[in-house]
Amino acid sequence: MSVFIDKNTKVMVQGITGSTALFHTKQMLDYGTKIVAGVTPGKGGQVVEGVPVFNTVEEAKNETGATVSVIYVPAPFAADSILEAADADLDMVICITEHIPVLDMVKVKRYLQGRKTRLVGPNCPGVITADECKIGIMPGYIHKKGHVGVVSRSGTLTYEAVHQLTEEGIGQTTAVGIGGDPVNGTNFIDVLKAFNEDDETKAVVMIGEIGGTAEEEAAEWIKANMTKPVVGFIGGQTAPPGKRMGHAGAIISGGKGTAEEKIKTLNSCGVKTAATPSEIGSTLIEAAKEAGIYESLLTVNK
């Protein structure tokens, strides 16, 4: 099993005729992802990379049966694209776009309340179920099928963690990039719940960063509910207060959201943390050995 997506997931690409979307559509198709439709208003009837283009999400869904959308639409128009996908009742929308205005996302979040559409992102690398379905911008080749779930606020740190696991012979179920913006859709707890309920996932890597309280809330949830080992890493340990570090949400303000605070909370809730990015893989191995599941995680031929 996997979480959120699998080899049967039918995907549409919003903004497919843009150069970034075209590049990544080809990469996703090469990975084996079932991309059945693209959406660009005014470009309906075209075919790009063998994928039919429609004017609206509703039309694309009705014609192809797509249930998931990935958005590469420029920031000023991305919020409207999310709302259009929600209006079409898609199961999930994965928004890659960065620099969406915060107020736009506040409106989107409010609009999605009570609706069935799950939003992942924005400003995220996407979601990948190893060897089955890649939706987003992550490098597919580093991901190998196995039993470790990965959830992260950072794209590049996700790739680093996955690469280390694969090099150690440890495959993954699904890797979910929840995005680095202050207002996003799916959060750590949503993904941890999914991993906790997934029979194939035996351990989890959670990568956070400075800013906000999402990691602390996740730590408390892990302590109360998680039945599988979780290891963590917090980015931004050397960040000065008030200085934004890369992501819009990665800022320490009012003395809250420091790496030190997050690490302390995670450790007190039973989550082992890696001191540096290069130790994420070895920290997972240590936790797996303590839990007696290390051998069962070795699914990749090195």
UniProtKB/Swiss-Prot annotation:
The active site is at residue 247. GO terms for molecular function: nucleotide binding; succinate-CoA ligase (ADP-forming) activity; succinate-CoA ligase (GDP-forming) activity. Pathway: Carbohydrate metabolism; tricarboxylic acid cycle; succinate from succinyl-CoA (ligase route): step 1/1. Substrate binds at residue 159. InterPro entries: Cit_synth/succinyl-CoA_lig_AS, Citrt_syn/SCS-alpha_CS, CoA-bd, CoA_lig_alpha, NAD(P)-bd_dom_sf, SUCC_ACL_C, Succinyl-CoA_synth-like. GO terms for biological process: tricarboxylic acid cycle. It catalyses: succinate + ATP + CoA = succinyl-CoA + ADP + phosphate; GTP + succinate + CoA = succinyl-CoA + GDP + phosphate. The keyword Nucleotide-binding applies. One of its GO terms (cellular component) is cytosol. CoA binds at residues 17-20, 43, 96-98. It comes from the Bacteria. SUPFAM superfamilies: NAD(P)-binding Rossmann-fold domains, Succinyl-CoA synthetase domains. Belongs to the succinate/malate CoA ligase alpha subunit family. Heterotetramer of two alpha and two beta subunits. This is Succinate--CoA ligase [ADP-forming] subunit alpha.
